[in-house]
């Protein structure tokens, strides 16, 4: 039977963990910090690239001799890699479902997982906006080129949910008309952003954090009642070779400094 993580329990865990204040500090001494075992491998959603990169640099500075190896990709691809035996110490996908699957496979211990941030969606447009898109309703105009993430990717699934919600305000069939304009489905959110930046698409639906990381793009906001709240979980892997170091990195992400970095990159605290 598949074990499903309780959002309420995860939120409570996060609130407790996030209560810690202060900067990113040195890891607690232990086996993981001994010579020859100072490499920490973190598998994280592509949308976390910039923020985790910054947190990682600060963590390495606070812990001389420690090297963090990041693997950023679509959450479902990362989960599959872990299931196939890829070595990882920490997993941070963009939805709870990927962690649920690993809990069921005994690759993550449920009690160690926690939600540590939230994100929402926004429509991004090329800087030139040659299609002259001004509103969400314009996305249903015929012959546009729209790029989305694949439905297996969290942001692709969230985009489909948001488009469905917009049917209520923009008219039945709006979602179908928008999907008729989709010219490609990408493997992660960064690929969606790249195609819009290159002018290969008139619009794409990405996370708010990705729009913050790409200030050259124009954007159209999605109203809160039609948007989707993405909750990101964070967990050490049960087979981690560096469990103490993994816990220390997670503590760094949950620290006041770590949370401030995440918010600078456009993420929001849990709510």
Where in the sequence are the language-model features?
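Short, glycine-/small- and polar/acidic-enriched structural segments
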Residues: 112-116, 121
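Exported/periplasmic ABC-transporter solute-binding proteins
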Residues: 19-62, 67, 71-72, 76, ...
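C-terminal motif of bacterial Sec signal peptides marking the signal peptidase cleavage site
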Residues: 14-17
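Bacterial N-terminal signal peptides that target proteins for export
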Residues: 1-8
């Amino acid at each position: 039977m598949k074990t499903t993580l309780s959002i309420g329990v995860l939120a409570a865990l996060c609130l407790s963990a996030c209560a810690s204040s202060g900067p990113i500090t040195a890891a607690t001494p232990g086996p993981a910090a001994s010579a020859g075992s100072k490499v920490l491998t973190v598998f994280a959603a592509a949308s976390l690239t910039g923020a985790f990169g910054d947190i990682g640099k600060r963590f390495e500075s606070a812990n001389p001799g420690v090297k963090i190896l990041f693997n950023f990709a679509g959450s479902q691809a990362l989960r599959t890699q872990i299931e196939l035996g890829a070595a990882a110490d920490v997993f941070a996908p963009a939805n709870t479902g990927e962690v649920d699957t690993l809990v069921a496979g005994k690759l993550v211990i449920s009690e160690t997982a926690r939600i540590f941030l939230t994100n929402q969606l926004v429509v991004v447009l090329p800087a030139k906006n040659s299609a002259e898109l001004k509103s969400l309703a314009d996305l249903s105009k015929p012959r546009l080129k729209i790029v989305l993430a694949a439905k297996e990717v969290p942001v692709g699934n969230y985009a489909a949910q948001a488009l469905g919600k917009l049917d209520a305000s923009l008219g039945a069939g709006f979602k179908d008309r928008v999907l008729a304009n989709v010219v490609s489905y990408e493997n992660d959110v960064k690929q969606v952003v790249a195609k819009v930046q290159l002018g290969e698409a008139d619009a794409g639906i990405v996370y708010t954090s990705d729009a913050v990381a790409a200030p050259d793009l124009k954007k159209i906001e999605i109203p809160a009642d039609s948007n989707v709240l993405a909750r990101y979980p964070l967990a050490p892997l049960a087979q981690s070779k560096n469990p103490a170091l993994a816990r220390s990195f997670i503590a760094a992400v949950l620290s006041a400094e770590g949370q401030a970095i995440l918010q600078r990159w456009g993420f929001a605290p849990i709510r």
